[in-house]
Amino acid sequence: MSEEIITPVYCTGVSAQVQKQRARELGLGRHENAIKYLGQDYEQLRVRCLQSGTLFRDEAFPPVPQSLGYKDLGPNSSKTYGIKWKRPTELLSNPQFIVDGATRTDICQGALGDCWLLAAIASLTLNDTLLHRVVPHGQSFQNGYAGIFHFQLWQFGEWVDVVVDDLLPIKDGKLVFVHSAEGNEFWSALLEKAYAKVNGSYEALSGGSTSEGFEDFTGGVTEWYELRKAPSDLYQIILKALERGSLLGCSIDISSVLDMEAITFKKLVKGHAYSVTGAKQVNYRGQMVSLIRMRNPWGEVEWTGAWSDSSSEWNNVDPYERDQLRVKMEDGEFWMSFRDFMREFTRLEICNLTPDALKSRTIRKWNTTLYEGTWRRGSTAGGCRNYPATFWVNPQFKIRLDETDDPDDYGDRESGCSFVLALMQKHRRRERRFGRDMETIGFAVYEVPPELAGQPAVHLKRDFFLANASRARSEQFINLREVSTRFRLPPGEYVVVPSTFEPNKEGDFVLRFFSEKSAGTAELDDQIQANLPDEQVLSEEEIDENFKALFRQLAGEDMETSVKELRTILNRIISKHKDLRTKGFSLESCRSMVNLMDRDGNGKLGLVEFNILWNRIRNYLSIFRKFDLDKSGSMSAYEMRMAIESAGFKLNKKLYELIITRYSEPDLAVDFDNFVCCLVRLETMFRFFKTLDTDLDGVVTFDLFKWLQLTMFA
């Protein structure tokens, strides 16, 4: 069979955002209606290949060196020398997608440090319903084979259907990355390829937390337990989690890079992700012993301590029970006592498939809300609470807790409202090839004081955070994809502030909120409005004679200034203010000033118009100096936000992002001329809108001529 190369169509920028919003409104992104990743439709592509007698070749993730990686697995790396891309049908006469159902032994790690992902896949095989959500039925290398397969993954709040071809990296006739123990099953290798595709390359999968894989296969939320500080009923929590079908993983922390994947005396691997696949209590010499079953994704290197495959403890267990539990083959799976587990391992991750009864004994439906947000330099990336001058500009979200938990759950404890916050940064693995990795992220929770409770959604300002301490916060700021914490707080209103640790670190994020009882949530943002002064009415007689003489000297005998003359006048005046950092006013900015002030439409400013403009600029200069807090002659982007409000404008965070992009320098400084240009532009646009909004409903309708007139000449 020949190969058919099918190139996907990409949408970018505003077009992509509009399409995404429309898709959500149509219900796309839920598991039963997954979004076609990169617009690739599995059925359409498969049918096309079958009709043309060709095998699918995916140009969105082509079989080329760049798909392997960018550094350690980059095109010039010795590790990728000799790698070829082949289909399973070229390797075996009778390859299989899945044989007798997916099992944990189908997943053996190859030459890639993605044990965290493989541990998650291994846990996935314990639940057929979950597995077949991720690995759809009906795929094979026999009936209807066209070299194309598909998988469904949860990506930052949406389910996506990811198409891949079956060209896999091969070296010396063997799969380079994940493979099955028998060597003839390929579902796990193709799932790994789909995951590599959404993250940009195979190398992007190196190193991570099992919780990432858990969540991307389920859409669930992960809880972390540091085993040195674990609750006394952790074993019961594990049993309940396994009963619910939750996915569990664990690892041993390392103290230095040299410890990475070091093997302990009893054959445990440090810095390596294991999956927890079972838990059972057995009668051992008349006492009940709690056991836990683990699996190493390598498919080998197993625990050799008590309760390992060949240990003597099994001789003192009822033969029937022993045969049910005991694992004899070298497949990476083993039992150990829970006591040894607590002693040897450092961290446990439990991904709850739905946010039901987290750490609770009774299962009930939790309420869920998801928000998307961004951190942008100069506008919404304020850093953590250690940076009080900028912390307040971070995105803010309000939670209203009304109902307390049922008393059955907590006995005599003080009543409160339980909820989980989970902050996840987006697309960081995909951006590794550009030198960007996980940012250090976290969040703080503030109680809204009674005098501010119930007010409309207003972004809280710097003074609030200077005067109020956080009521709760994430357990730590850490450079993981997601930070999640469970809280119990009294009823009331709270504000959540997600942030990076340092200011000016850019990124996109998803904030998920899970509450046991009904709760109100909202994103806080200022409503767009302007407190514009009435347009000044002034006669020439009211203007000071000295100002008239100065204007005559600058403007000439016609007593009018053109755009060029205005630029000359303003730059001559502003150059005398040595304390200001400025490059001078541009023709474009002076044209905006003329458009704002020109009453008779001749494109020039007369004496009265110039006098009004000059008084306005003097007011802007006063505001500029007030908010140039360090007296550097320029404002920071964050200082500019306060200055704009002082000038009478309230804008939402999206507009601030646009303004900072347009009017700040690369170092995020805003000089005086750019500040004036921004305020003039804002006033012009607000006044245009006010003129057109005749019924004062905040909505205007443009025909094409009006739109062009507004955008081209405002």
From Swiss-Prot:
Question: Where is the segment annotated Domain IV?
Answer: 543-713
Q: Which residues form the active site?
A: 115, 272, 296
Site residues by UniProt (Cleavage): 15-16, 27-28
Region of interest: Linker = 527-542
Q: What is its EC number?
A: 3.4.22.52
Q: Where is the Calpain catalytic domain?
A: 55-354
Q: Where is this region: Domain III?
A: 355-526
Where does the chain bind Ca(2+) 3? 598, 600, 602, 604, 609
List the molecular function annotations (GO) for this entry: calcium ion binding; calcium-dependent cysteine-type endopeptidase activity; peptidase activity
Keywords from the named record: Autocatalytic cleavage, Calcium, Cell membrane, Cytoplasm, Hydrolase, Membrane, Metal-binding, Phosphoprotein, Protease, Repeat, Thiol protease
So where does Ca(2+) 1 get bound?
Answer: 109, 114
Superkingdom: Eukaryota
Protein's UniProt keywords contain Transmembrane helix: no
User: What does the record give as cofactor?
Assistant: Ca(2+)
Keyword Protease assigned to the entry: answer is yes
Reported modifications of this chain: Undergoes calcium-induced successive autoproteolytic cleavages that generate a membrane-bound 78 kDa active form and an intracellular 75 kDa active form. Calpastatin reduces with high efficiency the transition from 78 kDa to 75 kDa calpain forms.
- Which biological process terms from the Gene Ontology are attached to this UniProt entry? proteolysis; regulation of catalytic activity; self proteolysis
Name this polypeptide is given: Calpain-1 catalytic subunit
